[in-house]
Amino acid sequence: MRIIRKKETWRHITFPIDKIEFLNWAKKGVQIILEDNNSYDFVEKEAIKALHLNINQSYNGPGSCYIEVPVIKSIFIKTKRKETIQLLNGTTYDKIELLNKMYDDSFYYGELGKYALSSSAIKNLIDSPKQYARSLNYKTDTSVFKTGRLIHLAALEPDKLETLCHVVEVQSAVTKKYKDKVKEIGDASFIFTRKEYDKAMYTVDALLQNDVWQEMTRGAKFEQPGFDIIKGYPFRAKADVLGTNYIADLKTTSDLKNFEWNAKKYSYDVQLYIYCNVFKIDYQDFSFFAIDKATGDLGIYDVTKNFFDSGKQKFERGLEIYEKFFVKQEEELNSYVIKGILN
């Protein structure tokens, strides 16, 4: 997606391309950010064509064209009215309304967790259609996931940290004091021992104090929702870091040296493929940030076309499994077995 940020000295929005070449230049979408930091995303072909029709070639010579701010807002509102999204259960949402609701984690992981697909859903389907079916009704929350969630909150959404997390002044989760807190809250998702919390904050401090992290995330938005229809199915996503010209996902790891291997093991390539489609970006504009929980070292990983293509293949395989067991119901889950030969 092309990103244009309006400068204070600009009277209008200026694009660094001739009008005649605009459609090709903007084919992956355009995001326009005004001085008040309000952004206007034009992704659908109809919206981009509407922009093109109202753009003026610059008078100062070739190489640029411009459009008035009120025109941008008018086009945005009119084209967005037509965008609706239908979930797997048939519920239809206005896309803007849906994106706004996705900031609410209870909606994102609740209703959308059941009635929209995601990179996690595709990974589960590839591993086992039974695992996907179970994930719709039963939540699995390992200590690794809990720690990762805590680090994400503290690093990307620190305002939520104080309101969500409970720290019990014990070293172990098997203590009576910890169990009493879980009983009081009714769920352990945001309850941490002092030991767990302090270890996570060490990792967060190392990340936030890293000069490269500070530079790359300056002016970026965090935890930005995205939604689109891919191959006829609704897909949800959240960009951990939405920069001016890139998207990044933050991962935690216990061993940074093995991150490249783990990226394949945990199918991060599927996430890459889905995010590129949902947010309309090129794979070259996507990166993974990996923070080592033990050392505090930060790894930054770009991706290749091979990694993107691998994600596409897994994505298509996951959809095949989904259609077979949950749409066309060509086979019952109870008949699913894994066969092999030991030699």
Feature map (PLM): residue ranges:
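Metal-dependent nuclease catalytic cores that hydrolyze phosphodiester bonds in DNA/RNA
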Residues: 79-236, 339-341
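Short, charged/polar micro-motifs that form catalytic or ligand-binding hotspots
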Residues: 16, 137-145, 261-266
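Glycine-centered tight beta-turn/hairpin loop motif at sheet-sheet or coil-to-beta transitions
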Residues: 8-10, 37, 234, 245
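Metal-dependent nuclease catalytic regions and adjoining charged, substrate-binding loops involved
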Residues: 30-36, 47, 81-94, 261, ...
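Intrinsically disordered, low-complexity segments enriched in glycine and mixed charged residues
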Residues: 20-22
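Acidic, low-complexity, intrinsically disordered interaction modules
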Residues: 27-77
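A short beta-strand micro-motif
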Residues: 2-10, 32
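Mg2+/Mn2+-dependent nuclease catalytic core
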Residues: 18, 218-219, 224-313
